[in-house]
C-alpha cells in the first residue's frame, strides 16, 4: 500500500471526533501520529465504552502512538516541546483560549518550530460564542 505521508510527524491533541478524525486520516496515509493525552483521563472518548473498550476511541485513534503529558507541568511541557521541535503538523480542537492556557497555542509552538503546520479546528471559529 502506498504511504504518501511516510516521514511526516503529527502531534494530535484532538479529542472526541474532529481532531482525532483528522489525525487518523493522516495516519492511514502513512504519517507517524502521536496522540498526546492528559494523564489519568486521556481523550474523553475513552469513557464511551462498549463491553471492554471504547469502539469510538479505537476507530478514531487507530495507527497512532500515544503519550500522556500534562503541559501545565514544566517537565511535561519540556517533553512536549521536544516533540514539537521534530513535528511537521500539530492538531487541536479546543475551545478558544484553551490551547494558550495549556501552553500549546500557535504563537508559542511556531516559535519553537517555524515550519510547523498548526491545525486549530473549531466548531464556531475563534470568535464564536462557544
Where are these regions (language model features)?
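N-terminal helix-loop segment corresponding to the beta1-alpha1 unit
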Residues: 1-130
